[in-house]
Amino acid sequence: MAKVEDLRQKSDDQLAEELVQLKKEQFNLRFQAATNQLEAPARIREVRRSIAQIKTLQNERAASAAKA
């Protein structure tokens, strides 16, 4: 899981790209869980939190851009 400080240094495009990758991983993890092939159940939680952190940063940036 990336730290928030590392995520803040990334550009909007990099964040969007990472978000897409995490959503793909989340889909694959859900599929593995449904078929009882999941080896690291904690990874689902990590991916979900990373997605939330990226979305939060994107919303913060959008709000600050709207104010400026």
Curated annotation (Swiss-Prot):
GO function terms (MF aspect): structural constituent of ribosome
Under InterPro entries, the record lists:
Ribosomal_protein_uL29, Ribosomal_uL29, Ribosomal_uL29_sf
GO (cellular component) term, any one? cytosolic large ribosomal subunit
Q: Which UniProt keywords apply?
A: Ribonucleoprotein, Ribosomal protein
Q: Name one Pfam family in it.
A: Ribosomal_L29
BP GO terms, sorted:
translation
Q: Which family does the record assign?
A: Belongs to the universal ribosomal protein uL29 family.
- The name this protein carries in UniProt is Large ribosomal subunit protein uL29
**Organism of this sequence:** Erythrobacter litoralis (strain HTCC2594)
Tell me the classification of the organism that encodes this protein: Bacteria, Pseudomonadati, Pseudomonadota, Alphaproteobacteria, Sphingomonadales
The record's gene field reads rpmC
